């Protein structure tokens, strides 16, 4: 097993590898120096969808960049394409379709979330993304994936759709229940393993226990960040899912990735601690569910999903003036 210290050192090297990280942000003068950060969490992402729909409806869209991990990357697409309600519609309309997310899909395709169905059929036909609006929006988008070879986060610059949709798929490919996504010679899985809430990358800060800042070539760090998380304030993470992934022995050929899995819970809690410290300093504003979130990874209850969506809307509406003041 590779040590956590070795993984951190490798993270420093890989984070400076331009091939992994994308290109410069837009110099558009109409954008603020505020980044929008979206945590993942499978169907918990419908909370984020509720927040984002209110921001879009109220014209609170002045972000220089959006950074999404897993479901956060999926939500980023509809926010950048200016399609209010799309992310919510997709989760509600297709929750019972076995092609969308099911163990049948896992058995037949190797992915619990059907790649062809989600990233081609829905994306292009059933509830199509407005690619023209996405591509013309100067806000930059980064999808956070985990480089399986190095066990480090990769900040994939989603410049154009439909060309870069596999970057979003890479970000949301959960370990043990998804095939690796190969892009430009790299193998990727869900970004949650290595950077669940990518505020440090956006702000150019050290992440959690790391000794060095997250460096992304040609990216000017944002001054502050609005961060949407999908767990309540008192959430404590266990390592049950990561232990399942390790015991599956799927990743014995990738020791750095196994090390990242083994240390994920500790790093996640360190990350949350850092996040709330930054909120106390005024550099970030965190929006979070007011109560523990009970929806499952493959939630089928439309009532539960709609309730969480409405909770996201309420949080955004209740704090709208605070959000506007923070961004300005």
PLM segments and residue spans:
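Patatin-like phospholipase
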Residues: 1-69, 77-328
């Amino acid at each position: 097993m590779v040590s956590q210290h070795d993984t951190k050192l490798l993270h420093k090297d890989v984070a400076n590898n331009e091939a992994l990280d994308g290109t410069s942000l837009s110099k558009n003068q109409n954008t603020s120096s505020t980044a929008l950060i979206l945590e993942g969490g499978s169907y918990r992402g419908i909370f984020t969808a509720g927040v984002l729909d209110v921001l879009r409806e109220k014209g609170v869209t002045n972000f220089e960049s959006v950074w999404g991990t897993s479901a956060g990357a999926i939500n980023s697409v509809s926010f950048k394409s200016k399609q209010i309600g799309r992310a919510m519609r997709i989760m509600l309309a297709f929750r019972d379709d076995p092609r969308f997310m099911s163990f049948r899909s896992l058995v037949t395709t190797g992915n619990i979330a059907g790649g062809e169905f989600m990233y081609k059929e829905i994306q292009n036909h059933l509830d199509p993304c407005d690619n023209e609006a996405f591509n013309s929006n100067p806000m930059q988008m980064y999808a956070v994936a985990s480089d399986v070879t190095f066990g480090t986060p990769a900040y994939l610059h989603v410049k154009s759709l439909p060309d870069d949709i596999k970057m979003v798929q890479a970000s949301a490919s959960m370990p043990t229940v998804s095939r690796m996504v190969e892009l430009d010679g790299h193998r990727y899985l869900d970004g949650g393993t290595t950077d669940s809430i990518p505020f440090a990358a956006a702000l150019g800060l050290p992440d959690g226990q790391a000794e060095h800042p997250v460096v992304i070539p040609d990216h000017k760090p944002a001054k502050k960040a609005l961060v949407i998380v999908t767990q309540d304030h008192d959430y404590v993470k266990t390592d049950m899912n990561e232990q399942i992934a390790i015991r599956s022995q799927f990743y014995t050929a990738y020791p750095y990735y196994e090390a990242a899995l083994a240390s994920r819970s500790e790093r996640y809690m360190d990350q949350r601690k850092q996040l709330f410290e930054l909120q106390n300093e005024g550099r970030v504003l965190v929006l979070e569910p007011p109560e523990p979130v009970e929806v499952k990874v493959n939630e089928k209850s439309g009532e539960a999903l709609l309730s969480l969506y409405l909770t996201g809307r309420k949080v955004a509406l209740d704090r709208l003036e605070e959000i506007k003041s923070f961004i300005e």
